[in-house]
Amino acid sequence: MLKIGFFADGPWAHKSLEKIIENDDFQIMYIVVRYDSVDKVLVEYAKRLGVPLFKHRNVNSGDFIQMIKKFDIDINVSMSFNQILKKEIREIAPLGFINCHAGALPFYRGRNILNWVLINGEKEFGVTVHYVDDGIDTGDIILQQMVEISPDDRYGDLLEKAYIACADTLYKALCQLKQGTAKRIPQNTIHSTGFYCSRRVMGDEYIDWSWDSERIYNFVRGIAIPGPGARTFFKGEEYIIDKVELINDMPCYIDKVGNIVGKSTSGIVVKTGSNAILVTRVLNADTKEACAMNGFYIGNRFFADKHICPPPEHL
């Protein structure tokens, strides 16, 4: 029997927990949720399993550590938990503290990885189970799985793929740990540096129309709803550019970026830094409802910044 402490939040955790509890060789001893949120699904799981559910402002505090030591667990697992885990809590369990990260470590450490892999135009993304150490996503790798990204995948599609892949990879890693066959691969043996991705914040969602068309295409799908959506301004109002298509054989030429330079039955053609891109769906930024495309005319212009967007009568 492998006795597990589960530090977790959200759909990532729900899928993983569902798979773990199907195996009679695994026993969840307690569940620790984020202090700043309420995960009703994990609350119900704790009741169903008959295990305590903890919420603590600082899981590294002495009182919390003493409390969970009593459970005599074999391993602690982190799945979308948001507190830094210091040395003392990492060493409570004999098999250590492991984390499941939706990134192909040592690349794509950090935050908002599924957004970044799409923005970067990747053809696949990784899911990695690794030991937690003093760094951020730098611990030795136990197991890694690569997942294909299709050309039409958007942020929501990757989330669904990642929920399943994380659950599968974590489950396999726990099986290996129980059997004593788990690997321990230092990340610097894969690449000497790897790289980190920053947390995306408000203000990062605006399209720079001077980017080339492929970059705009990847940006739009990379932060599509349920993300914030790729934003732009038109006649002083904010809109979400929800879907775009690359235009085959579109020549490169110089013109004012953001200008609407054509229309078709599919949408509007907007000038980019390289050539032009077809915008097929625009949403109202407040209601998220689709806008009628006949309200956008050739010669009108999209802007990345409201403060440089001329008054409507000048557009």
Question: Which sequence ranges carry the predicted segments?
Answer:
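One-carbon transfer enzymes
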Residues: 1-231, 237, 262-278, 284-288, ...
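A short, sequence-level motif marking secondary-structure junctions
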Residues: 242-249, 281-287
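A conserved acidic, glycine/proline-rich C-terminal tail/linker
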Residues: 247-267
